[in-house]
Amino acid sequence: MVIPADLPALVAPVAWMLGTWEGWGMRAVAPTPGQDRPAEDAPADTPVVEEIRGDVVGEQMRLVTRVYAGEASAPIDPTWDAAQGLAAIQKGDLISEETLYVSVAPSDVPLPPPGQYNSREFTATSASTEGHSAVWDGVSVGPRVQMVSDAIALGADATRLTHLGRMFGLVAGELMWTQERTLDGEDDADVEISGRLHRTEQASTDSGEVIDGIDDSRDGFLV
């Protein structure tokens, strides 16, 4: 696998996330204003269509995540892959959009043997159309990312949160992710949204070189 010469070294540990990803997922029903949790008779979790775009911005990675309402033409099957879900779920109105900037910390640890991965710490900042801005701490280990935030700024109409947690992973060439949240006044976190996406477009460096990021046949990545 050829690594583009102008790919920033601090982006390489998360380069497997770059490009355009499209897929589907499930989203928990949001509480109404003034209500901590949905009513018992509220609808169950609903299907959504998701798009994630990862790009290189200087020494950072930018992830833009868009979530759209979905209407399924058949009963939801949790085993659907990204393509099957997209074929069965009609894309509706935009629910939310988030922009996230990831900054990987420098490391002088020697590269591990093939098939092994060094953990890399990072920080991130995000802002969403739902009125949440957050500062995140995270770690990347191979094609897996885990990140948390307890520093969340809330807009006037935003759902009141005290904690966010997010996980990403590469499984059989698909990007899988989940986000949990802890509502204000609650002790336990609930899964807010999940997703399963396939890559539809590779990212490129400033020179125009394609960033592979992933060897689908071996579940490998750049660094």
Residue ranges of predicted features:
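Soluble ligand-binding/transfer domains with enclosed cavities or grooves
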Residues: 2-223
